[in-house]
């Protein structure tokens, strides 16, 4: 696994964060050291896939990056005639996802597409995964994407939505931000790396509260919505149609 050193030296002209070749190369290390509870979420996605994926249906991983959630789901699906469709708008991520998934034998076909998730049709879905993806979409596009997912899910289908959260109470919000930064420092990131990455993400990752997500999902039509995992200011919501 290549180590993330992207922000380790001072960057004079710090641009917006992008999922380019450099990020794709170190992404597994970056996300493990940056997102508390990430491995737990990936493992649980497989457990949820085993429970919710139905025969003759499709599974979508929207914003699949290098395919960790796709692989976890595929390893645990026990039903026949299931297809997994992974989508990411970063060509370097897509290329690595294909390589990663092709390294493991499976009878479940996986199609990895390089496209904007807003352009993808969702059809005959028993499970949809949005793992730290929605936060990178313009806020005005989030409702329409969730509506499309809801329409494309079969009755009883599952959406897994993992995100970084903000909190209404400033004291709590600041505490959880500080704990997240402490988590990153404990994983070997310097103060410079933490501050430069935070600045690079400022304009491209706009986060909502967990309550905003839950209300939005209920407004879309989901019958059962619940926060099932949280560690500091990162968490995951399940929504069942």
Swiss-Prot record:
GO molecular function per UniProt: carboxyl- or carbamoyltransferase activity; S-adenosyl-L-methionine binding
Keywords: S-adenosyl-L-methionine, Transferase
GO biological process: tRNA wobble uridine modification
Binding site for S-adenosyl-L-methionine: 38, 63-65, 88-89, 116-117, 131, 198
Top-level enzyme category: transferase
EC number in record: 2.1.3.-
Organism: Actinobacillus succinogenes (strain ATCC 55618 / DSM 22257 / CCUG 43843 / 130Z)
Role: Catalyzes the conversion of S-adenosyl-L-methionine (SAM) to carboxy-S-adenosyl-L-methionine (Cx-SAM).
Signal peptide region: none
Stated family: Belongs to the class I-like SAM-binding methyltransferase superfamily. Cx-SAM synthase family.
Catalytic reactions of this protein: prephenate + S-adenosyl-L-methionine = carboxy-S-adenosyl-L-methionine + 3-phenylpyruvate + H2O
Keyword match Transferase: yes
Complex and partners: Homodimer.
Protein name: Carboxy-S-adenosyl-L-methionine synthase
């Amino acid at each position: 696994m290549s180590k993330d050193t992207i922000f380790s030296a001072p960057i004079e002209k710090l641009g917006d964060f992008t999922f380019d070749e450099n990020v794709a190369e170190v992404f597994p290390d970056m996300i493990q050291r940056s997102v508390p509870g990430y491995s737990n979420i990936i493992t649980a996605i497989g457990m949820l896939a085993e429970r919710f994926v139905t025969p003759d249906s499709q599974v979508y991983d929207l914003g699949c990056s290098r395919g960790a959630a796709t692989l976890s789901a595929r390893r645990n699906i026990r039903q026949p005639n299931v297809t997994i469709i992974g989508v990411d708008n970063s060509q370097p991520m897509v290329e690595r996802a294909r390589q990663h998934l092709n390294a493991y034998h499976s009878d479940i076909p996986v199609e990895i597409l390089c496209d904007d998730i807003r352009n993808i049709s969702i059809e005959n879905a028993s499970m949809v995964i949005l793992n730290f993806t929605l936060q990178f979409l313009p806020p005005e596009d989030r409702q329409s994407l969730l509506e499309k997912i809801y329409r494309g899910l079969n009755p009883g289908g599952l959406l897994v939505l993992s995100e970084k959260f903000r909190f209404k109470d400033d004291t709590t919000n600041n505490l959880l931000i500080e704990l997240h930064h402490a988590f990153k420092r404990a994983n070997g990131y310097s103060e410079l790396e933490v501050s430069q990455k935070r600045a690079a993400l400022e304009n491209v990752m706009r986060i909502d509260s967990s309550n905003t997500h839950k209300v939005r999902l209920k407004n879309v039509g989901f019958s059962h919505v619940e926060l099932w995992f949280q560690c500091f200011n990162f968490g995951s919501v399940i929504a069942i149609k």
